[in-house]
Amino acid sequence: MENHLPNIFYFPNCVTAFPYRYTQKELDDMKPVDRERFKYAVFPLIKHRWCRAYVVRDNHTFKLNVETSKRLRRVAYPTLVPLVGVNAALREYVMEDGTKISFECYSYLICKRTTSLHDVDDSTIRGLVEGGNQLNIFTNSVGSVTNTVGIFGNPNPFAKVPLKSLHPSMQCKIFTSWARRVPVVLTGDTGVGKTSQVPKLLLWFNYLFGGFTDLSTLTFEVQEKPIVLSLPRVALVKLHSETLLTSLGFEEIHGSPVSLKFGNMQERFVNTRFSRYGIVFSTHKITLNTLFKYSTVILDEVHEHDQTGDIIIAVCRKYIRKLDSLFLMTATLEDDRRRIEEFFAESVFVHIPGGTLFSISEAYVKNSNDPLNRFMYIEEEKRNLANAIKTYTPPKQSSGIVFVSTVSQCEAYKQYLSERLPYKFYIIHGKVQNINDVLSDIYDNDGVSIIISTPYLESSVTVRNATHVYDTGRVYIPSPYGGCESFISKSMRDQRKGRVGRVNPGMYVYFYNVSELRPIKRIDFEFLHNYVLYAKVFDLQLPEDLFVKPTNVTRLHDVIEYIRSFDISDDVWTRLLSSYYIHILEYAKVYARGGSGALALDSFERTGNLTDDALDAIKSLNMRAKILSHKKASAHTYALRCKLLFGVYAGKVFTVYHKRPLTGYITMIAEHSFIPDY
């Protein structure tokens, strides 16, 4: 019983469930099993109404102070003797000694001395109904959307949400999984409301029932914590928090149950009146440093295998008993299900059926060239793309999204297509600062808009008038001092396809052979020092405790030994990880020393502003590379072939670009930037 969600506590999606106030007459007419549902109202009452309640006497009737607007003095609890009369109109009982007591006051006193929900009887349920009505926590299949105003202090009504994720049957499944306190893996096609609705649903459950060890024991000792939706990028934090905030009837963050956590936050994003039961939208790095401050941890975009996200999963597995619940959300399990089943001994898989609201058609445009013949393959791809946009053209006032792999390709493809097609072209990727302005121009365009983007648009921004996707099927995978281009994975294909079909029927045109799709093991292309450093902080065993293990374990051990050579204590590493970005491992030496150099370097990592102090701090690390050769790359650029002379990757040959043909040595400032050694 305790793990099943009574239908009177469904989240009001304003389609199948609405706020509702139950009368005592309705309660009397119910079957006993239906009256039992109201017992669970005791938990939100303890948290949100009775937490500030005390007994008063109002015209010879004992009440709770929260039942009246009068300023009455606290009085001693009355002695509870058998009830002999019920006045439903006045909502009060008469006890055997003639004392009058309100339904809610009686329930409050009974629950104060009761430890089992099983012992709550019909007389007590009357007061729970009255208190629950005041909190506006009950729902019914009939009602009005306007009644959602004020549930969380919201000035406007909740949004109407017809998505599958808030259907009553899915609410029950998700609640049962949440209440079991085992890891939950939530899947569902793009467009069913995983990210936009499930966190809102878990916020509702946390508001009602969070902070209690179980839902069969009565206690006024509540360990309330917020929940967190952890995301890989700041853009996602802003996007999804704004969506949830608006859907809950808020126009601003202040005083709402929503809080944001990301680096360099402006004051306008700070909620100074955040509720303890609320939801935090956080970047993975900040989540990792504050993990145990939350009751429920929700990790989104698990299929991306963001490095910090995978570390969070590893830490959660080791300390799962410190969390009330863990939700892993992903569009598809095709690449990860077996590993998740191995990694978590106990886990529940919940799938939200259905896809986007509108159908999505597909078209395949074959490239006759071998992808290994890169020049010929790309040239034909451009021609195919131009012809496909002519054939499968978005309607006026709509847009199409072209997915390419790099920022430089965005520029090249825009130039090629704009010379051949009479449409407006736009570029969106993670380095574009004014994305909202670009989107405004797209929405204001009465004609056809074509957006060229990197994988950034797979999830970071929703383009609401997008009807077509043109997918080259490629992604650039960075690696230390280099990188390579690869075909995408099945989960990335699903994400890209799901960008359309939300407000209108969609079209997905792809230019690659689906047989090329395969999982991408990102850990094999990454700097590994964060895995090692957070293993120190959280006492993880490497590589055994990692969610995804590197193929080359020797490289992992090389990193462990290199970090040991820094001679920095574990306590200092813990402090550094919670205070600095440390994009380049060697920066930790500067941060450990402290002083003005550390302050300047920290500012550089956060803002990109390279001051003289920051430059001097970096130079002190002797991060040099030898220039092996150079050649002209373009009219104004030279490619410098270099060999790294420091760190775990010493000896690696890589390429950087400069406006002049250099010889000698360079000093690396960051992974892809440098200064010449003159």
Swiss-Prot record:
It comes from the Viruses. PROSITE patterns: DEAH_ATP_HELICASE (PS00690), HELICASE_ATP_BIND_1 (PS51192), HELICASE_CTER (PS51194). The keyword Hydrolase applies. It is found in: Virion. Residues 175-351 form the Helicase ATP-binding domain. GO terms for cellular component: virion component. Residues 371-546 form the Helicase C-terminal domain. It holds the Pfam family DEAD. Belongs to the DEAD box helicase family. DEAH subfamily. This is RNA helicase NPH-II. The lineage of its organism: Viruses, Varidnaviria, Bamfordvirae, Nucleocytoviricota, Pokkesviricetes.
